[in-house]
């Protein structure tokens, strides 16, 4: 049971959990009430850094959600890498209670990664997409070589973006690649030709919720747990 608990916590959370448990021990040595407060913080850290197994659909045609959260907006915008090209932007807001592990939205190859410095205003605001610190991935899909752009965006509280993907890496749908600590936003930019299957206000689950299809939806899906 302990192994399963540790296995289902993202490694980025280990140091926070160890420090909070140490603080709990010291807190109980000082007073019971202080120890209880510190222990509650430890449990919150475990909850925040949880990394549950997901049932991921299979297929090069699929684009799944890169993050847990709420879809704030779906709209046509200029591509962030080519202002002459129109794309569909799906914005996902992660509150502090969501799972914050990010997953690859489409099977393909990482064409580039880019760190973009910026501010730390609330990630629920539209202007955070342009002003806040973010990490950008550009993925070339296996199917028809479409470019899918993904921005991990820091928020008011989230000030640490972790991205383990690298240029030239072959990635699979639903594969874990990073995490954003303590509330954030993820924007995904898709070709206009994609068939969107979600709506504004919908709650999505990383690796499981299908955001769109590169071509028409298949009649049957297969899944795997990762």
From Swiss-Prot:
It is an enzyme of class 4 (lyase). GO terms for cellular component: plasma membrane. Its EC number is 4.1.1.65. PANTHER family: ARCHAETIDYLSERINE DECARBOXYLASE PROENZYME-RELATED. Heterodimer of a large membrane-associated beta subunit and a small pyruvoyl-containing alpha subunit. Belongs to the phosphatidylserine decarboxylase family. PSD-A subfamily. This is Phosphatidylserine decarboxylase proenzyme. It comes from Ehrlichia canis (strain Jake).
């Amino acid at each position: 049971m302990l192994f399963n608990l540790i296995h289902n916590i993202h490694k980025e959370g280990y140091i926070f959990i160890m420090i909070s448990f140490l603080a709990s021990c010291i807190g109980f040595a000082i007073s019971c009430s202080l120890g209880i407060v510190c222990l509650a913080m430890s449990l919150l850290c475990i909850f925040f850094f949880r990394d549950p197994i997901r049932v991921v659909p299979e297929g090069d045609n699929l684009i799944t959600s890169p993050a847990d959260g709420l879809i704030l907006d779906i709209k046509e915008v200029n591509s962030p890498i080519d202002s002459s090209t129109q794309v569909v932007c799906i914005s996902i807001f992660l509150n502090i209670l969501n799972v914050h592990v990010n997953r690859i939205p489409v099977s393909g190859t990482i064409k580039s990664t880019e760190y973009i410095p910026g501010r730390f205003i609330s990630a629920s605001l539209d202007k955070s997409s342009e002003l806040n610190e973010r990490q950008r991935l550009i993925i070339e899909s296996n199917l028809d070589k479409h470019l899918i752009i993904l921005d991990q965006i820091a928020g008011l509280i989230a000030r640490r973006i972790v991205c383990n993907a690298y240029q030239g890496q072959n990635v699979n749908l639903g594969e874990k690649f990073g995490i954003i600590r303590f509330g954030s936003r993820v924007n995904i930019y898709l070709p206009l030709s994609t068939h969107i299957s979600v709506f504004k206000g919908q709650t999505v689950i990383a690796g499981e919720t299908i955001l769109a299809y590169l071509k028409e939806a298949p009649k049957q899906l297969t899944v795997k747990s990762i």
